[in-house]
Each structure stands twice: as C-alpha cells, then as structure tokens.
C-alpha cells in the first residue's frame, strides 16, 4: 500500500513538472514572438527612413576618377607616407611677398609673349609705320615687368625656396635683348620724310617674305594676271630700280612676240607667271617708312645727330635687328617657361634632368607645329618653304649675295626637309650622353639604354635625310622649272619627297607611347602625345602625296589642308609631352585629376592658339593691301 502511494506521488510530481515546463515554453515562445515583432517593426521603420533619403540614380560611380590620391584605398604604407608629406606650397600659392607685384609680372609677361610681340611681328612684316611705336610700348612693358619681379624678390622672406635658379638672370637677359633689338630697329629702319606722291608702284616686286595672298596686277601685256603670293613694293625714286623694271618689261614683250599667235592663252599666262616670279623674288631695299604719327619719332628721325649715327651704324644695326627679331620671340617663351618652372618649384635637385628631357623635346615639337602652321599661312615663301614653287635667277643670287640661303643654295635649294633633317641629326648627336646625366658616375641602366637608342635613331634618320636631300637635288630642280631658261640657277617645287623627318617623328611617338612608366596615369599621358605625333607624321606624308599628284605651278602658297591637321597634332603632342614630367604627373595625381582632364585642356588651348596665329597672318595680309592702296 505504501509502495502504491509512493508511485502515485511520483506520478503527481512528474505531472507538476511537465505542466511547469509547458508553461515555461509558452512564456518563452511568447517572449520570442514579441521580440520578433519588435525587431520587424524596427527594421521596417529603418528601411522606410533610409529609403526616403536615397535619391534614385541609374548608375553609381564605382571608380576612383577625380578622387584625391590620399583617399585611395589601395595605397601601400610607403605610398601613403609619401603623399601625406607631399608639399603643395609654391611661389604661386604662398601669401609671402608682394603679391600684386608678382601678379603684375605674370600678366605683363603673358601679354608680351602672346599679344604684343606677335602683333609687332605682323606690323614688321607689313612695313607698318606703327611697328616702332608698338615695339617701344613692348619695351616699356618689359621693363616694368622686370621691375615688378625685382620688387617681389626684395619683399619675399630671406629663405630661398629654389636655390641657384636662373630665372632672374634670364629675365635680365630678356630686358637686354629687348633694348638691343629696339635700338637696332631704330637705327636700321629706313625712314623718309617724302610725300606719298613720290612713290611709284612697280609690278610684282615682293613686299616681304610672309605675304601669302595672291593679288591681281597689270602684266607686261596689259591684261590682268595673277601675281605671286606677295603684294608689290613701292619703289624708291632711283634710276637703278626703274631701269630694272623697264628691262624686265622689255624682256617679257620680246618673249611674247617670239611665241607666235598659236600659243594658247593658258600657256601664255603660265609664261607670264614664270617671268613674274623672277621679279617677285627680286632683291630690293625695303621702302622707307612715312613720318611717324608720334611726335617723338618724327623729331628723332629729322635730327642731324641721329642721321649721322644711322649712316655709320645702319649696316651693323640691320644685321643685329634681323638676327634678333625671330630668336627673341622664341627666347620670350623660354623665359616664360623657366619662370613657370621656378614659380612651381619644378626641377629641383636631380629632377632637373627629367624636366629638361621632357620640356626640351616637347618644346621642339611644339615649335615645329607653330612653324608648320606659319608655312601654311605663307611664311618664308621666298625660300619655297610655304609649299610653293620658286626659282632663283643668277641676277637674284648676285643681288642677295649677303643672304647665305641664296648665296650657297644648291640647284634644288635648301628645303625645309633639309633643315629638319639637319636639326634631327644635330640633336641626336648632342643627346647621346645627356640621357645618362641623372645617373652620372653609375652604371648604365636599361632605361638609359632605351632612351639613348632613340638618340641613335635621330642620328641615323637625320643623316639619311641629309643624304636623301643630296640625291633629290636634281629632281627638285627639274620639277620646279615651268620651262627651260638659262639664267635659272636654283629651283624647288616647294617640297622634297624626303620621308625621314616624318619617319623620325612617327617612330618617336610610337616608341614613347609604349614606354612603361611608374604609374598607369603617366603611361596614359605618354600614350596620348605619342599617338598625336604619329598622327601628325602620317598627315605630313599625305601632304607630299597631294603635292606630288597635283603639283603647284606658281609661287603662291599651295596651302595643303593636311598641314592644318599636322600642325594641330604637333602642337598638341608637344604640349602634352611637356606635361608628362614626373612632378607634373604627381601634382595631377595628388589633386585627383585624370589624364583626360589635361588632354582636354591641351586640345582647347592649342585650338585657340592656332586661331590666333592665323588671325595674325590674315591681319598682316590686310595691312599690306591697305598700305599698298594708300600710297
């Protein structure tokens, strides 16, 4: 009985435990359900609030373009340490020194380089009476610019941020060259106080070397015929000039009578153009300028002491003036570039070699682009460098014996391809050991050998170009003459089918575009200017093909449209080349710029520069025609 009661007691306890456990499970389930409900409500509220703040877009940027390099997640500890210590302070960004003086110096130097001096070159080519006044204004602004630089230097703290820089020296030299050039111009420019009525026009005598627009003049037979690419001069009242013009007219009439009535009008016009070419490139003294409108110049030119000084020094002054006119234009930009480098603290220490290598080479291609566009506009047409047909007579070479290009000209003349080949050969010869300057005293690395191999290419292609010019000498002479004439001693069709200058530019672009750099950013920029140079050389070869298939038969500039594209590629390629220095790349990477950012800016700047250069040539042509009709 007792055992039965014990068993019942155990069953009762077990039932109690089961009931308690079920109650606990129910409580736990209820708690869990309540927690899940709370979590669901919370997450729903969070989702609603976050969705309300999101702006829907089709795509979100997932690349690092435009992101400053310090925000890049892929930097190594060594790279992050370098960029955290990167210093962006320069002469341009600091507030030390007289900032107004520095800004004035920068603005005036840019004004001289891009506006005043180029405009003065156009006035000089047009023999305008405003040339000397503008040259004087140019000199005054240059003096004030150098003085402003001196003020900034004296007000800057004692610490020297760029030790042993040469910008101060180059600025002083610029001022000296400006002074010498101005006084040489004052002494060498012929001035006459005679009236306009004393000038008589002489047909088909060139006004200058830069004129490129064909004009209609009265030919010897009394009918209008197209002249060369240059307008007529107004002769001095001298028996020599008048006699020369008279003899030329008689010779043309005699040749016209011998041709007979069966000669077609087309052949007659071509013969007249050929005879006119002799007169067009004939040597003649530049016409005297009319009295200056500015009183100080009128008083100066009538002064007895000035006339005596000019009589003794005019020859020397004339040589100095012509030697400085265009080189001074290039030196202004050299000074400007050096100032940009010093102002941004570029090229300090061993980095000077990387800077010079890129800026010298890039500057050469940029200059070549400027010259190519000028040739398209008619620059140096008297030498046949404007893609124009030209012939030199024995009388011309005698009267221009002081000009070495006329005096020593071979039968095919000195072409622009000859000049380019010589410069390529010279640059390659001097550049062999320059590539090792950064590692002077150490072993030659693979990078040094890779660079010096390009110098070897320059030597080889430059020499091949010179030899090709020698072989094509007779070919140019025969293809330039319109008909046989005994007194023609040199002639050129305006080009030489010499592929080596274009070949050199093409392979320079290809080799450097594939040259591995320290970063992908730098490699991309090298690829950009490498391809641009290659494209430019391709269009230069198309120019040769066009002129070979459709030769230019007169002395007017042929203006092949392919040269416009060539000029753009050389200008833009040279500018991007100069931007690809190590320090320039680092400055752009630090600020998060992309390679296309600088490329876009370069394309826009070059387009504006080309437009400005063409405007200057068109304006110069208009000045020449206006001056001709006013005298």
Curated annotation (Swiss-Prot):
Localisation per UniProt entry: Membrane
Keywords assigned: Glycoprotein, Isopeptide bond, Membrane, Phosphoprotein, Signal, Transmembrane, Transmembrane helix, Ubl conjugation
Task: Just give the chief location class.
Answer: membrane
Q: Where are the transmembrane segments?
A: 106-126, 132-152, 171-191, 323-343, 352-372, 408-428, 452-472, 530-550, 599-619
Q: How does it sit in the membrane?
A: Multi-pass membrane protein
Q: Name one Pfam family in it.
A: DUF2427
- Cross-link Glycyl lysine isopeptide (Lys-Gly) (interchain with G-Cter in ubiquitin) lies at 250
| Chain intervals with Polar residues compositional bias | 220-239
Alphabetical GO biological process terms: regulation of cell size
User: Looking at the UniProt record for this protein, which Gene Ontology cellular component terms does it annotate, in alphabetical order?
Assistant: cytoplasm; membrane
The glycosylation sites annotated in the UniProt record are: 87, 98
Lumenal face of the membrane = 21-105, 153-170, 344-351, 429-451, 551-598
Q: What is this protein called?
A: Uncharacterized membrane protein YCR061W
Q: Which domain of life is it from?
A: Eukaryota
Cytoplasmic domain ranges by topology? 127-131, 192-322, 373-407, 473-529, 620-631
Question: Per the record, which residues fall in region Disordered?
Answer: 216-274
- Phosphoserine sites (modified residues): 219
Signal peptide span per the entry? 1-20
- Which organism is the protein's source? Saccharomyces cerevisiae (strain ATCC 204508 / S288c)
Please report which protein family the annotation says this sequence is part of.
To S.pombe SpBC3B8.06.
